A protein has these predicted regions:
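Surface-exposed loop/turn motifs in large extracellular/passenger domains
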Residues: 1-14, 19-145, 150-261
């Protein structure tokens, strides 16, 4: 097993819970700021490893908890500005001493979580070892997006179908913080295959009461139960796949909303 803890410091590129083309059983990555010790991550945080042959057999666990103070104001806008009944949210970030300039992934950078073989004829997978990713965002500034799955976007390698695949399930929880991009239950241009009819990927965006103080959540983009298709410039832009049921739950201080797909 591997356990990475970052409490302060400057990391110019990526953080990987797994290995570089290597294999591990479980990974745990904690990027947690203590006593306002600045943490700066120049690129991304991955629960899994780097490279198409990198594998995490069992589980990945990623926790992000950075200091962030922000003021969030919601106000009704006039009909002259926008469609009647809609609101406008103003966000003032009071400090960004610590930040992640890229995205956060439960899976790997081309690497897999769990083990299986993809059947291209019917877009299913025979799973020999089921894996699970856990991502929890407690607080902090994230410039990119949050993914329960992995990244299947090659840079110099030839594209392979298994890149960034999760053979199992994903769990993503957002308790607070500012996410400039989107939140996905799946990965980016990668696949999540589940072994039975349970949830293929689950994403929670929660706004809970902690120590008598309501934690603020701002997601500048959208929330998706599935994955990100990427852009038209990539050769594998049409591959994000989630096999199984999708449950999206948004929990606020006032109510709980559940959407089934």
């Amino acid at each position: 097993d591997t356990y990475i803890v970052v409490n302060k410091g400057y990391i110019g590129e990526n953080i990987y819970g797994g290995g570089y083309a290597g294999t591990v059983y479980n990974t745990k990555v904690e990027v947690t700021e203590e006593e306002y010790n600045q943490i700066y991550v120049g690129l991304n945080v991955f629960g899994g490893g780097k490279g198409v042959s990198a594998t995490v057999y069992n589980t990945t666990n990623v926790l992000i908890d950075l200091k962030l103070d922000m003021e969030v104001t919601e106000e009704e806008v006039s009909t002259a500005e926008i469609t009647s009944g809609q609101t406008k949210v103003e966000v003032e970030i009071l400090n960004t001493y610590s930040k992640i300039l890229g995205s956060v992934y439960g899976g790997g950078d081309l690497g897999q979580v769990g083990q299986g073989v993809i059947n291209t004829s019917n877009n299913t997978a025979a799973i020999s070892k089921e894996g699970t990713t856990y991502v929890e965002i407690k607080n902090g500034y994230i410039e990119g997006s949050v993914f329960g799955g992995g990244s299947g976007v090659p840079t110099v390698e030839k594209y392979e179908l298994r890149m960034g695949t999760i053979y199992g399930s994903t769990r993503t929880i957002v308790n607070g913080g500012y996410i400039k991009g989107n939140v996905y239950g799946g990965g980016t241009q990668s696949r999540v295959y589940f072994s039975n009819k349970d949830d293929a990927s689950i994403i929670y965006a929660t706004n809970v009461l902690i120590e008598e103080k309501e934690e603020k959540i701002v997601i500048n983009g959208s929330v998706f139960g599935g994955g990100d298709r990427g852009n038209s410039a990539t050769t594998n832009a049409s591959v994000p796949t989630t096999i199984g049921d999708v449950l999206v739950t948004i929990i606020t201080f006032f109510s709980e909303l559940t959407f089934m797909n």
